[in-house]
């Protein structure tokens, strides 16, 4: 008899218009939403298979944050990990990653939480890019967390972002188990 799925809850956070909902809908419903409708908050569910184990995952797609917005207490209760999304075409959204991470750490009173930083919209033309791949990697290294670029439009690295999140959660829950040799996974 297969083991029961482990329950995991992930919050998707980031500035407005970075593609948080697009990443989530692409991952859960396997399609890309062309039009933009600001999200208030949605919750999605999907089973993620990671290292042979099923994870019943609840994904909380939050409204966009800015430095003055307050993350709701619902964004902390029972959350196992955070995917912080920025747009590679927005320097401001990249700069907000640090602010959002600090808000999460301060609210939880923690030095480290399971995080994945995702640079979304990697399909945009190079002249639209304001944040380099190396800058994203360096931020992941600084935060000691996983990092990847992704494109919800092209379905590039979307599943990888969620797999990395489960990996970061599992690493934090089972610190004695090696997770590929280092604290940070760069893709």
From Swiss-Prot:
Alternates between an inactive form bound to GDP and an active form bound to GTP. Coiled coil: none annotated. The keyword RNA-binding does not apply. Small GTPase that acts as an allosteric activator of the canonical TOR pathway, an evolutionarily conserved central nutrient sensor that stimulates anabolic reactions and macromolecule biosynthesis to promote cellular biomass generation and growth. Plays a role in virulence. It comes from the Eukaryota. Signal peptide: none annotated. The gene is rhbA. A lipid is attached at residue 184 (S-farnesyl cysteine). Belongs to the small GTPase superfamily. Rheb family. NCBIfam families: small_GTP (TIGR00231). A motif (Effector region) lies at residues 36-44. It is found in: Cell membrane. It is a lipid-anchor. Induction: Expressed throughout the developmental cycle and induced by nitrogen starvation. Expression is up-regulated when the organism is grown in cultures with the presence of human endothelial cells as well as during infection in mice. InterPro entries: P-loop_NTPase, Small_GTP-bd, Small_GTPase, Small_GTPase_Ras-type. GO terms for molecular function: GDP binding; GTP binding; GTPase activity; metal ion binding. It is an enzyme of class 3 (hydrolase). One of its GO terms (biological process) is negative regulation of asexual sporulation resulting in formation of a cellular spore. Disruption phenotype: Reduces virulence in a mouse model of invasive pulmonary aspergillosis. Impairs growth on poor nitrogen sources. Exhibits increased uptake of arginine and leads to asexual development in submerged cultures, even under ammonium-excess conditions. Also shows enhanced sensitivity to the TOR kinase inhibitor rapamycin. GDP binds at residues 17-22, 33-34, 120, 123, 152. Keywords: Cell membrane, GTP-binding, Hydrolase, Lipoprotein, Magnesium, Membrane, Metal-binding, Methylation, Nucleotide-binding, Prenylation, Virulence. GTP binds at residues 17, 19-22, 33, 36, 39, 120, 123, 152. It catalyses: GTP + H2O = GDP + phosphate + H(+). This is Small monomeric GTPase RhbA.
């Amino acid at each position: 008899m297969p083991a029961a799925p482990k329950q995991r809850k992930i919050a998707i956070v980031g500035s407005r218009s970075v593609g948080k909902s697009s990443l989530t809908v692409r991952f859960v419903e396997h399609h890309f939403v062309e039009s933009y409708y600001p999200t208030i908050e949605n919750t999605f569910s999907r089973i993620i298979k990671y290292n042979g184990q099923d994870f019943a995952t609840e994904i909380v797609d939050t409204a966009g944050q800015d430095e003055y917005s307050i993350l709701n207490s619902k964004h902390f209760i029972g959350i196992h990990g955070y995917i912080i999304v920025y747009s590679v075409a927005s320097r401001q959204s990249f700069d907000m990653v640090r602010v959002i991470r600090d808000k999460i750490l301060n609210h939880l009173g923690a030095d480290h939480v399971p995080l994945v930083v995702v640079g979304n919209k990697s399909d945009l033309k190079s002249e639209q890019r304001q944040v380099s791949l190396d800058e994203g990697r360096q931020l992941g290294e600084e935060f000691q967390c996983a990092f990847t670029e992704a494109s919800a439009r092209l379905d590039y690295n979307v599943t990888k972002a969620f797999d990395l999140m489960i990996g970061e959660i599992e690493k934090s829950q089972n610190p004695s188990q090696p997770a590929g040799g280092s604290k940070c996974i760069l893709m």
